[in-house]
């Protein structure tokens, strides 16, 4: 417990981050066992200027919002990473957490090597199935007119070239030290950037349910979900219903900006606890580390 008479939302968020990093309960308050700490006051009113070193860990947490305010945006409103001051080879958040933990006697492995997590976005679960009868008929006619008999044969006899469940099952057996995290896109309405499968298709639901029996599956919200009232709720609801468990992780469509605090608050209200979509528009990596 870090001593503070009136901890606010910023203190709560930092406490949650430290708890996850250290593996122990961290909070701010005035209990008898509370420890003193160097309080620069930055957490009272977080701004866009980097705070003193003592609050550097909190700064990493807030940097997503800082860059949201300052970085140049692309045509979809996503921050451009080429102007961000960062080094993708340095795990800043981890180093700050270790350094701060040492100061308060919390033991952390200095050379811990986490197991790799491979993130798989399923934008198109199937090439042919699960897209509605109009798409199926129209696609078949197109393939016949083009003379694409291989595609016609795949439509009739399979296997579907996009359905990769068997591949990932073999991957998991070959690399048991790794973890797979899937994010499935179930767009309620088709659009320019949403041309995937239908969430009400029995074939789609069965395939996702089977995938969820072995791997972690989260929601991959569609481009159009940002523009429809209740769009997040509807698509996350489909994933909840199919898997039979609450959806705790989500990842925004790559073309949508993921740094909006109102968006994250909306997801929190829907029960989502982890956002995996902090990409820049033009460079690899995450904004906060």
Residue spans for each PLM region:
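Metal-dependent polysaccharide deacetylase catalytic core of the NodB/CE4 family, i.e.
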Residues: 124, 128, 149-150, 166, ...
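Conserved hydrophobic/aromatic pocket- or pore-lining residues that grip, position, or stack substrates
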Residues: 121, 220, 267
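Short secondary-structure junctions
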Residues: 25-29, 247, 274
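Residues within well-ordered alpha helices
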Residues: 18, 171, 238-239, 266
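Conserved residues at the C-terminal ends of beta-strands
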Residues: 3-4, 253, 278-280
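C-terminal active-site subregion of NodB/CE4 polysaccharide deacetylases
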Residues: 239-243, 258-289
